[in-house]
Structures are given as C-alpha cells and as structure tokens.
Amino acid sequence: MVKIEDLQRITMLKGFPDHLFEILAREAQLNIYGVNTQLITIHERVDTFFMLIMGQVAVKKELTPRVDIIFDYIQSGSSFGTSALMEGSTASYTAVCQETCEAITLSGKRIRELFKENHELAYYMLLGAARQYKNKMDIRAGMIMKALDENPELKKDIHDIEDLTHVI
C-alpha cells in the first residue's frame, strides 16, 4: 500500500478521480532500488509498471553493437513499464537506475485484472499512457534524426530505423 499523496505526484495520473487513487494506493507497492539496478530488459517480458518518486532511470537502446542511445532520463513524477498494462508485451528498451531510486510499482497482472473489474480505471490509466507515449515518440524521433544527421557514418549500420522509435 502507498500514500495517495505519492500517487498524485505522478504526471500520468494527473486528473484522476479520488476514488481511483484509492484503488491504486491499495494495490501498489513502494520499492527502493540501488544504482545500476536494471529494472527492465529489452526483449524480455514486462511484468511491473513503475512510477518514479525519487531518483533517475536511464532508458536506452542499442543503436549499433558499439553505440547505445539513451532516449531518456526518467525523473521523479514520471512512469515507465507501460507494456506491463498489456498482457504478453515485451520491453522495447532497457531501463537502469542511475542513482538510488524510490518507485511505486504495480503488478502488470493485477492491474490488468483491475481493468476488467473497473473500466473507468482502465480508461484513465490507458489515456494517460497514450498521452505519455505520443509525447515521448515526438521527442525521440527528433533525437534519432538529429543523431543520424550529425553522425552520417552510423546510417550504414542501422537496418531498421522504425525499430529505433518504438521505445516507450
């Protein structure tokens, strides 16, 4: 169980009705992770949805065998692991703690069960996830194009440019 006040600090949950915060507060856990803890691994199943209360998490993906791109540094108030909201989804990135992190977590399996029981909760959670996804995709597509424009030699090593942008 977590405090409703902590949940209200999460950007994706802005505008949530109070009664939905109560449901999430009962189901969520508070966890602390150390530096370099890998929370999500690319191409592996995502079973946990994370809402960062404190710390910083790097979201990265291999561009070439020698170069990783860090797409984002997730800060307090942000969420990640949205794939956990959909059954059978795998990660399209790796997420690693850059410092000690405190995160509210929700079991993907449990939140999907709650979605079936409470369609209003499903609506608000997935609406927040969709908004977050669009914002991130707009930013990341621009970052990729800028990196490739500044480093044209990398273009020959990239086989699927679309695959690079499919990171949430």
Predicted segments, located by residue:
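Short, contiguous pre-domain boundary segments
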Residues: 4-6
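Regulatory nucleotide-sensing modules
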Residues: 8-60
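Cyclic-nucleotide recognition modules
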Residues: 9, 71-127
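A small-molecule sensor/coupling module
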Residues: 21, 91, 110-151
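Short solvent-exposed loop/turn micro-motifs enriched in small/polar/acidic residues
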Residues: 24, 42-44, 64, 77, ...
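Local beta-strand/beta-hairpin segments that build beta-sheet-rich folds
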Residues: 39, 70-71
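A short beta-strand-loop-beta hairpin characteristic of the jelly-roll/cupin
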Residues: 57-69
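Phosphate-/nucleic-acid-contacting segments
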Residues: 147-168
